[in-house]
Structures are given as C-alpha cells and as structure tokens.
C-alpha cells in the first residue's frame, strides 16, 4: 500500500493518485463539541510541504465518496483511507462522543446511508491509547443506525508510537480482535530507527499477535524506502508516491513486493 501523506485538500486526492498512491492519509481536526470539523494538519508539518491546506470535513468526505464510487476513474486506484484523528484537542472523556459523531458523519456523507456510497476501506488512526473509546463509540453508532455491515470496511491504528504490548492490551479493552494496522514513524525532517517497526512486524508474524498490517511514515528518500521494504512492511506513507513506485520496480523488490489492488483485503495478514 502506497499511502499518500497529508492529503487534506480535495485537489490533492487526484494529485496523489496520479503519482501512484492507492491509499491516502487525511488529518481530521475536531471542534470543542467533538464534531469532525476540518481536514487540516497545521504547522509544523513535514519538511517541504504546505501545512495549511484544508477543507471542511463534510466537503472532503463527499469528494472522497465521489472518487471511490464505481464509475469514477479513481475508483479502482484508491481504496484505502487513513483518517489521522487529531484527538489531542479533546478531553479524554470526549473520545466516545467523537467516535459517535465521526460515525454519523461518515454514514451520511461517505457511505450515503448505506446506499451506493464510497467503497474505500477506512482506517481510524488514533494518537492516544487513552482514547480507545472512540473505537467503541464508532462501532456502537453504526450498529445502532442499522449499518453494522459497514464495520467490515473499517480498521484501526494507534499512531502514538507506544509500546506494542500496551497497544495490544488497549485493543483487548476495546474488544477489537482484527482489522488492525500498526504505524510507526516520524516526520521526514528527522531520522528514526527501525527497532519499533521490527517489533510491530514480529507481532504481525507471530501466532498470537493482533497486528494485521504494518506501515512506516514518512518515507521520502530512496534509501529509506529500501530500508523500509527490507523491514517487510505492508505500507509506506510518503509525500512522494512516485519514488515508492520507482523503488518497488527495482530488481531487488519487484519480485518480492507488489502494489496492492482493490481485490486485496487490508485486514488479512499476508503469509509468505
């Protein structure tokens, strides 16, 4: 999965898909009442990027629905969306409410109330383990609204670079048993080692681990891309999807990796 980083403006959806992304990451900021408000990152952000691009969340999600509905030229090119949920602005007790409001919003504006809505898989990426009730609030709301089937399209990620054991315990608290992606990384302005990504991959490949897929961010340089692939990740989040595509075509990688398609299930652990 080639995950276009910080796609917060409607025009950028096309831009990143055209460069080779089959997945995008979008930042979601919340208002004081825990409603998803903007797709916005703000400063500081990755080196070389404009941190201030934004849309109203509803407008972005409607455009995303259009892009990921059969008949659209992007439909079979873009099939995974990571919502990077900026819950740091919320009180801990608002996490469940944020999940409820996010679910209602996506149900209406993305899934079109279950009537021929967008088809991409969605990952809810949460920066704080304490906010795990966002997941339970989200799940319960879709069930209450009569659309539990949409949870088949939803996965989860804790993005705070916490200890993998703590992450696993938090999923147990939330009652999550699958659809788990694990991120690891740091802004492209800095370097980060591979210790934790290796631990995440080990959990993914172990008999009793909860992780299904592992991705690393933000990977922009050619050598870092190679090092990341050598760590056996499932996804690379990048500002330059065309560089990831280029490296995947190198002799060392083209037989070992392939770019995911719409037919690939992002919740299934890949077994060699």
Curated annotation (Swiss-Prot):
E.C. code: 4.6.1.-
Tissue: Expressed by the venom gland.
Disulfide bridge positions per record: 45-51, 47-189
Active site: 5, 41
Cofactor: Mg(2+)
Similarity section: Belongs to the arthropod phospholipase D family. Class II subfamily.
Name by which UniProt lists this protein: Dermonecrotic toxin LvSicTox-alphaIC1bi
Species whose genome carries this gene: Loxosceles variegata
Phylogenetic placement of the source organism: Eukaryota, Metazoa, Ecdysozoa, Arthropoda, Chelicerata
């Amino acid at each position: 999965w080639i995950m276009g980083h910080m796609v917060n403006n409607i025009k950028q959806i096309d831009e990143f898909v055209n460069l080779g992304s089959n997945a995008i990451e979008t930042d979601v900021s919340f208002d004081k009442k825990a409603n998803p408000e903007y797709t916005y990152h703000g400063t500081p952000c990755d080196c070389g990027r404009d941190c201030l691009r934004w849309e109203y969340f509803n407008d972005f999600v409607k455009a995303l629905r259009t892009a990921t509905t059969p008949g659209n030229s992007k439909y079979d090119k873009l099939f995974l969306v990571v919502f990077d949920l900026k819950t740091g602005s919320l009180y801990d007790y608002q996490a469940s409410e944020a999940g409820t409001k996010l679910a209602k919003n996506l149900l209406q504006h993305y899934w079109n109330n279950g009537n021929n809505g967008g088809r991409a898989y969605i990952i809810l990426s949460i920066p704080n383990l304490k906010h795990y009730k966002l997941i339970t609030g989200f799940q319960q709301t879709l069930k209450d609204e009569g659309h539990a089937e949409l949870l088949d399209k939803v996965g989860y990620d804790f993005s705070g670079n916490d200890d993998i054991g703590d992450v696993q315990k938090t999923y147990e608290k939330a009652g999550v048993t699958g659809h788990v992606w694990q991120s690891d990384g740091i802004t492209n302005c800095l370097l980060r080692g591979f210790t934790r990504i290796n631990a995440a991959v080990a959990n993914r490949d172990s008999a009793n681990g909860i992780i299904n897929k592992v991705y690393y961010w933000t990977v922009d340089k050619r050598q870092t891309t190679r090092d990341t692939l050598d760590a056996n990740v499932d996804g690379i989040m990048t500002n330059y999807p065309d560089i990831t595509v280029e490296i995947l075509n190198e002799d060392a990688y083209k037989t070992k990796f392939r770019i995911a398609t719409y037919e690939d299930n992002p919740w299934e652990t890949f077994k060699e």
